[in-house]
């Protein structure tokens, strides 16, 4: 029996979510969903991770964030569900930190992964004072 679960996430930015999936080398596809709100057509972009058993994993936009929808009993990814979420969250956060920091003039100069799986990113700015 199939039981799909919606997991609340903090993934709010499609660009960073796609970058995180790419870093984990997890293939996905974009899926546009038409929404007819107040007679004006809008589209949500959801991400689908195809699985060979046809129980695909999806990230559905709920208007605020991407919810992870999956059936854990049919999960066939290289990582267990909890590990997948942790790794994806870490790559997502790293991407947000680096991208947003670059917008204000910082560049990553060092990145270190610790034994516990956490990362430390060192940022610097090349601002010269006269």
From Swiss-Prot:
Pfam family, any one: DUF1257
Keywords: Chloroplast, Plastid
InterPro entries to which the protein is assigned, alphabetical: Uncharacterised_Ycf35
Subcellular location: Plastid, Chloroplast
GO cellular component: chloroplast
Family designation: Belongs to the ycf35 family.
Official protein name in the record: Uncharacterized protein ycf35
Species of provenance: Skeletonema costatum (Marine centric diatom)
């Amino acid at each position: 029996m199939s039981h799909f679960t919606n997991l609340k996430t903090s993934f709010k930015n499609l660009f960073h979510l796609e970058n995180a999936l790419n870093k984990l080398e997890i293939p996905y596809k974009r899926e546009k969903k038409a929404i007819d709100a107040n007679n004006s057509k809008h589209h949500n972009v959801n991400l689908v991770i195809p699985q060979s058993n046809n129980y695909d994993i999806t990230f559905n936009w709920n208007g605020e964030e991407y919810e992870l929808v999956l059936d854990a009993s049919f999960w066939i990814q290289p990582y267990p569900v909890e590990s997948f979420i942790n790794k994806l969250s870490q790559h997502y956060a790293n991407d947000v930190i680096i991208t947003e920091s670059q917008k204000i003039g910082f560049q990553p100069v060092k990145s270190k992964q610790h034994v516990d799986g956490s990362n430390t990113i060192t940022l610097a700015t090349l601002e010269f004072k006269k």
